[in-house]
């Protein structure tokens, strides 16, 4: 989860109260205090609230929670003066584009850092490390509209941010620190995305690097913001950035986006989403019957627009920067936060039952202890995944035991995983900026034929990772679990031929281990050797071993 540094001077000015009150109350909106220093506080906000990833967003939420300013924030948007056209050839590379202009911003070194931190935290929280969303922030004074979002040849040259000489896009991907880190996001394409002004000056090479011409300084007052990506999350990210800048006094201005075929979008779209919420829904989730007036009050404290239609129904307007409101349950959660969990009455169950540890928990304890003892860190990725990750990236054939999501909201979460290893490789891909070796494991759920099972899987990445290393780990794990086993030659296509083996217990295949083959490593954009194993422990749960 992102840790946001909030400087007291900025925080008190934007919130309108003292730091002691803020530090005392901010955990109640969904945050953990990490560190309290003389000049600043580090706060870890939950990943479902990217609108809190900045001092401006946190202050906006706290003003409501402290009853200093309640209800739906209103942002005036000026008519557009800037337009940008989208070319046909970019649609197969990075098809979604959101843009806005914000004028009259007064920057200091700390507010620039806050904006850049928000940008990077959104890249992580909404953007899947820039894959789904990448954000460019530009000084508008050095470029000339209208702008163009298009694809160009890899030999196209410009001066990238923090450099003084021109480089081709190919050279940027090979030599620039940002280029080498994010080159995999544009690999496989014959052309690369670019945003140009009317005089062919470069604003951005998304999702890699901006041009140096539009770098933001303390003298910058007017900004052009571009957000590119693979889906509609770009519009949410845009709304979060522009409303944060508006909280600091900036004036938002529409941008006209002209798409191929003449379709036009006028962005940002800050119109709130409207929902209907009933008192019955609230009672069913928090266990208390709150009057409609109390529900309206608490929703307004949490910065929603709310109006009672009758004694049982509330019309709720959801701010356009709230990425986490997917269901009415999310509204009820915010009502509970506003009302105060400490104020929700405890109800003692009328019947007595004796509790005991679940068999899965009894299995989890020794598994975790063994893997941690072997030097691995536990991770907990999502059970939802996609066919691409679960099968294609692993070079495995699609199976017919898959449970699919009926109406997925993301192409990354269309099915329940049938194996754990791909999720671990995704985590390695997201942590390439950290030092090696990296060793991670998970004891978690998989679903096959609508039946839930428990697997343990682990991966290790570093230049010297080999079959011997993973064999020793599997052997140690099986011995510590007091399981007699044998290994046989494996034909699992995810692993390198001759460096893979299946694990059998009592004649039944339990799992597989070995060196991941180069094609798998490449598909997850990993640059070093990876070894791993996965074992099905379902038949062992509840048994004495």
UniProtKB/Swiss-Prot annotation:
Q: Which domain of life is it from?
A: Archaea
**Can you tell me which residues bind Mg(2+)?**
324, 330, 333-334
Q: What is its main location?
A: cytoplasm
Q: A single GO CC term, please?
A: phenylalanine-tRNA ligase complex
- Keywords for this protein: Aminoacyl-tRNA synthetase, ATP-binding, Cytoplasm, Ligase, Magnesium, Metal-binding, Nucleotide-binding, Protein biosynthesis
* Reaction equation(s) it catalyzes: tRNA(Phe) + L-phenylalanine + ATP = L-phenylalanyl-tRNA(Phe) + AMP + diphosphate + H(+)
Q: Which GO terms describe its molecular function?
A: ATP binding; magnesium ion binding; phenylalanine-tRNA ligase activity; RNA binding
Localization (cell): Cytoplasm
Q: Please state the span of the N-terminal signal peptide per the UniProt entry.
A: none
Which ranges carry the B5 domain?
270-346
Question: What transmembrane ranges does the database entry give?
Answer: none
Which cofactors must be present for this protein to function? Mg(2+)
BP terms from Gene Ontology = phenylalanyl-tRNA aminoacylation
Q: Which Gene3D superfamilies match?
A: 3.30.56.10, Bira Bifunctional Protein, Domain 2 (3.30.930.10), Phenylalanyl-trna Synthetase, Chain B, domain 3 (3.50.40.10)
Could you tell me the EC number(s) of this protein? 6.1.1.20
Task: Say which family it is in.
Answer: Belongs to the phenylalanyl-tRNA synthetase beta subunit family. Type 2 subfamily.
The entry describes its oligomerization and partners as: Tetramer of two alpha and two beta subunits.
Protein name as annotated? Phenylalanine--tRNA ligase beta subunit
Q: Which organism is it from?
A: Methanosarcina mazei (strain ATCC BAA-159 / DSM 3647 / Goe1 / Go1 / JCM 11833 / OCM 88)
Name the gene.
pheT
């Amino acid at each position: 989860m992102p840790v946001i540094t909030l400087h007291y001077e900025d925080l008190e000015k934007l919130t309108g109260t003292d730091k002691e009150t803020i530090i005392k109350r901010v955990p109640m909106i969904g945050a953990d205090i990490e560190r309290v220093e003389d000049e600043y506080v580090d706060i870890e906000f939950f990943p479902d609230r990217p609108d809190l990833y900045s001092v401006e967003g946190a202050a906006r939420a706290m003003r409501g929670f402290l009853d200093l300013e309640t209800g739906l924030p209103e942002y005036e948007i000026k008519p557009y003066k800037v337009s940008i056209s989208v070319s046909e050839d970019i649609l197969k590379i990075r098809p979604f584009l959101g843009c806005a202009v914000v004028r009259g911003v007064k920057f200091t070194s700390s507010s620039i850092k806050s904006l850049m931190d928000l940008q990077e935290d959104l890249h992580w929280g909404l953007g899947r490390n820039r894959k789904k969303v990448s954000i460019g922030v530009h000084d508008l004074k050095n470029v000339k509209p209208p702008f163009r979002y298009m694809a160009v040849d890899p030999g196209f040259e410009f001066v990238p941010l923090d450099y003084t000489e021109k480089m081709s896009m190919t050279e940027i991907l090979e030599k620039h620190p940002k280029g080498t880190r994010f080159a995999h996001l544009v690999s496989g394409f014959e052309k690369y995305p670019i945003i140009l002004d009317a005089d062919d000056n470069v604003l951005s090479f998304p999702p890699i690097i901006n041009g140096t011409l539009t770098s933001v300084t303390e003298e910058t007052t007017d900004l052009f913001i571009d957000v590119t990506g693979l889906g509609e999350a770009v519009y949410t990210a845009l709304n979060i950035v522009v409303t944060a800048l508006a909280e600091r006094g900036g004036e938002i201005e529409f941008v006209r986006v002209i798409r191929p075929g003449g379709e036009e979008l006028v962005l940002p779209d800050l119109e709130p989403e409207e929902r209907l919420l009933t008192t019955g829904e609230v009672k069913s989730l928090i266990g208390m019957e709150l009057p409609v007036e109390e529900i309206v009050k608490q929703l307004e404290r949490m910065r929603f627009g709310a109006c009672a239609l009758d004694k049982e129904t509330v019309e709720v307007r959801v701010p356009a920067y709230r990425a986490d409101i997917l269901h009415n349950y999310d509204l009820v959660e915010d009502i509970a936060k506003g009302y105060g969990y400490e104020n929700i009455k405890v109800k003692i169950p009328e019947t007595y039952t004796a509790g005991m540890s679940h068999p899965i928990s009894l299995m989890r304890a020794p598994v975790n202890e063994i893997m941690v003892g072997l030097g691995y860190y536990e991770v907990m990725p999502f059970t939802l995944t996609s066919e691409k990750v679960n099968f294609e990236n692993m070079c495995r054939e699609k199976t017919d035991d898959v449970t699919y999501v009926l109406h997925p909201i993301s192409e990354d979460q269309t099915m329940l995983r049938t194996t754990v290893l791909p999720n671990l490789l995704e985590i390695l891909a997201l942590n390439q900026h950290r030092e090696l070796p990296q060793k991670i494991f998970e004891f978690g759920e998989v679903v096959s034929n609508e039946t839930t099972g428990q697997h343990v899987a682990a991966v290790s990445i570093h230049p010297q990772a080999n079959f011997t290393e993973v064999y020793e780990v599997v052997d140690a794990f099986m011995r510590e679990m007091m399981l007699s086993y044998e290994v046989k030659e494996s034909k699992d296509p995810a692993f390198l031929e001759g460096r893979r083996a299946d694990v059998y217990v009592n004649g039944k295949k339990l799992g597989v281990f070995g060196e991941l083959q180069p094609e798998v490593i490449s598909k997850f954009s990993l640059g070093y050797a990876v070894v791993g194993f996965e074992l099905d422990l379902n038949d062992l749960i509840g048994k004495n071993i």
